[in-house]
């Protein structure tokens, strides 16, 4: 899930389906004001969980990122890749002793950027590529030098993979129903029929 808050205060998208949107909006406005990205956590153990609207239980961890041309110069290129249906991932350092906000942008064949050291970069790229191959977004927990099974460093990997294809042969009533379901489930649906009238 993703949500953008513009300088005008306008909101695009949703993170929690309304549960903590008000608190996230306020935190986002603060990020816009200070131009400093931040991590926030809302959960049932927080004293203010009910106050911010987290009545459904659970925990939500968010990284609120300030984005403009100077802070995120790769943003337009990433958007173009997504528009062209090319797989791309962004690995952002969201928790560490230093370097918060550092990022690596990667495709299936190349990567640019750094999280601070070569070992951490290598581990993050390896983990992010595996997530990108499955179209999965997840936070990687690593050691400061990329060690596995540690949680000193958190790297949030956003994967933007093209939708899987569903090819339906035969343009009949049944195909129309399957196409609607396929599209609803996130597939890029193609219906093929040898009869020009129905294709």
Sequence positions of predicted segments:
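Segments forming oxygen-rich coordination pockets for charged ligands
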Residues: 1-199
